[in-house]
Amino acid sequence: MTLVDEFDQLEVDGQRRRQHLGMSVIGGDPRKLWLEFRWSFPVFENGRILRLFDLGNRIEDQVVDRLKKMGTIKVSATDKEGNQYRCSFLGGHMGGSVDGVVKQADPENPEEVMILEVKSANNNRFRELQQGESYEDWSNDYSVQIQCYMAAFDLKRALIIVYNKNDSDIYTEIVEARDGVLDEMIEKAKLIIQADSPPPSPYSSTDYRIRKFMTQKQQAIYNLKQLPDDINCRNCAHSEPVFDGDGAWRCNNFSKPIDEATQRKGCEQHIWLSSLVNLPINGLSGGATTYAKGKALITNAPKDQAGK
């Protein structure tokens, strides 16, 4: 293994699946969101891309730090307990965290509190932003994200700062809140969280957003042509999300709550959600499910029943 390979593997191994539906992604493809929420969509395996993501996060932190040192705008990145400002809905299964809140961003209304949102972009994307109509027109996902933040924190405006990773150019804009976006996204998230099967894809299987931005493995799982690599509680037919906790899940096979570590590990009683198998069900017996694939029968059973 070369040094570059080791760098890449370190990034890949360091990934952790998100426990909730984040406001940064909730405006996106509902099928992909469902697969990610069920810990079934393959994680990135490209270390270089993961390093770019990490670099973007570091740049965004640096911008917040520079704003604090400038002193022109008052910045608060954490609450009184030193925690990042967060919001959550639907029993903790949907949520988000903001880069901070600011005052004095508008000289005409210096005491107004605004959301602070910092992004980074490569040169091509940055030029698209500069030449476009607005930040919200630039990215639907970012538009939904900032609208959800403003509504969740009951603020009317947000200060946007976008940093060009190629030449350090900076773009700023103040975005106005719009009614209804958060409510719409909460309803979307609720449908995803409650669903036992993935929502229909908004794209055809040959759409460029699938072919260009997904690996072959990701495409196969997205199109339900292949089972996920990861076996865990979230893609098991026995589990379900609980809405009266903090992102809680329950196993109906053992009639008990399951914590994050248990969810990630799974157990020998795992049975695939039938929607992920994506074959006609031929029969159910003793916890096992039999599927028909042409003339062949395929049985998905807990490990202790395998081969019986």
Where does each model-flagged region fall?
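Short, glycine/acidic-rich beta->alpha junctions
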Residues: G92-H93, W138-S143
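Metal-dependent nuclease catalytic cores that hydrolyze phosphodiester bonds in DNA/RNA
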Residues: M1-I115, N122-R127, E133
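Glutamine-centric residue-chemistry signal
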Residues: Q84, Q145-Q147
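Soluble or luminal CAZymes and related metallo-dependent hydrolases
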Residues: L55-I59, D141, V181
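Conserved active-site beta-strand-loop modules that form the wall/rim of enzyme catalytic pockets
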Residues: E111-V118, K156-I160
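Residue-level recognition of conserved beta-strand positions in structured domain cores
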Residues: V102, V118-S120, V162, N253
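Metal-dependent nuclease catalytic regions and adjoining charged, substrate-binding loops involved
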Residues: E128, E136-N140, C148, A152-S255, ...
